[in-house]
Amino acid sequence: MARIAVIGAGMGAMATAARLAVAGHRVTVYERGTTYGGAVGRYEREGFAFDTGPGLLHLPAVYRDLFVKTGKRPLETCVDMVQVNPAVRHVLPHHGIDVTLPGASHGGVATALESAFGAGAGERWNAVLGRARDAWDATRRPLLEEPLRPGARQSLGGDPYPALRRSGLLRRRPPTLAEMADRELGGALAEVLTGLVGEYGIDPATAPASAAVLPYMEQTFGSWYVRGGMRALATAVYERCLERKVAFAFGAEVREVLVRDGRAAGLLLADGSEAAADAVVCGIDPRQLPAGSLPWPPEAVPARGDGVPGRLTLLLALRGARPATAVHRTVVHAPGARVTVLRPDDPATRPDEEHEAVTVSAVTGPGTSEPAELLNLAEKAVQGLRERLLWHEVRTPADIEAATGAVGGAVPPPALAGAGGRMLRPANTTAVPGLYLAGGWAHPGGGLPHAGMTGALVAGLIVEGAEFRGSR
């Protein structure tokens, strides 16, 4: 039985802790804050409740596998998880388009797109997602289910999306997602694809075309909501950790990773005490630790996250019942800006049936850096929004940093193949024996499913060693 110290109580860190505890190790999680879940938070006021982090789960198989591998009770007995259908509504006011797409139905999506965007739109969309499926099939194992191997940055640096090649610029280099969407979809339909990718904090103008795997995953595996809010999923993972005898130390800020005899040997805490360990898992952005506290030079700190944007979020308390025709998720597209509006049909989010809780969020940038800008766009999705508004709360990147410690409130996106490897995350192993990286700032990147997968990868590397070949 090894002693494992885990830094942070985010979703990836807790997934790692639960898997290691099942393998027989003694695991302690050290969290600087007062609670678990990392970015998966919840805000409550006057009977209203809001998710302050991710509001939906894509690729739920990651958490189903976690619960199967760590206990007798499957995920569905621990949380009430429902597939969202319709999956998403797209509002493009500058084009006069308002279209609602069904969940996990390629045929249904194609039919809806044909109606909204004209003849051939559904066929073009399915062709793009078909090529995205090829990219998914080519990279699913090395990009999501296996540790990042030496040389992976070279092998995954090429874009696996089989874009339609044309003369000119695209002969000299692979297209960006925006270029691919413009060529293969065109016009307003291209904005739908780039908008879905942009929700992840990825810039379509610089991202590789392989980013189309993200809309492919959503459409193929569906979008899922946990009743009671996504915080209920974090609570379920936390409770599974407790069942497996994982210990949690809250208010325990880490000052330094201790290295003795050339390997990680524990943690130095802010109160001056030391926590000895046989292995250390860093489940946070390493930039959160004080400069010089890591056993490598500052310029070599992994997951620097340069240019990773944060989120601006509005929590809206509305008078009046949620309309029966309301769609759970709406993306409002505007020139140079987009917002996501979440309207869950969940009694746990509102004081009674005569009120509604709505969350509006956007990646910070031009057109989405001020609350008023978000509210203006959200009006396109929620009829009579301003007249119904009782009160609202604003969550800025600075608020996220204060709550979670994430530098600049940055929210890491999933790792992607292509772009010369610049959209990959650092490997789960490090140059220091016994020190591992988990969570959204490590391979395979951010987002609930990807961060959750770090649990399987890090646990496998610790339990099976360097010969571990990935999750099965």
Place the predicted regions along the sequence by residue.
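Extreme N-terminal leader/targeting segments of oxidoreductases
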Residues: M1-I4, A23, A417, E467-G470
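N-terminal glycine-rich phosphate/pyrophosphate-binding loop and immediately adjacent elements
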Residues: A2-P142
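A conserved FAD-binding loop/helix module that cradles the flavin
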Residues: P54, G440-A466
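Active-site/ligand-binding neighborhood in enzyme catalytic cores
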Residues: R133-R244, G409-L416
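A glycine-rich dinucleotide-binding beta-alpha-beta segment and adjacent secondary-structure elements
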Residues: A188-Y200, G384-P444
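A conserved beta-strand/loop element that lines the FAD pocket in flavoprotein oxidoreductases
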Residues: C241-V254
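Mid-domain catalytic core of redox enzymes
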Residues: R255-E353
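C-terminal segments that line or cap access tunnels to active or ligand-binding sites in enzymes
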Residues: L314-A403
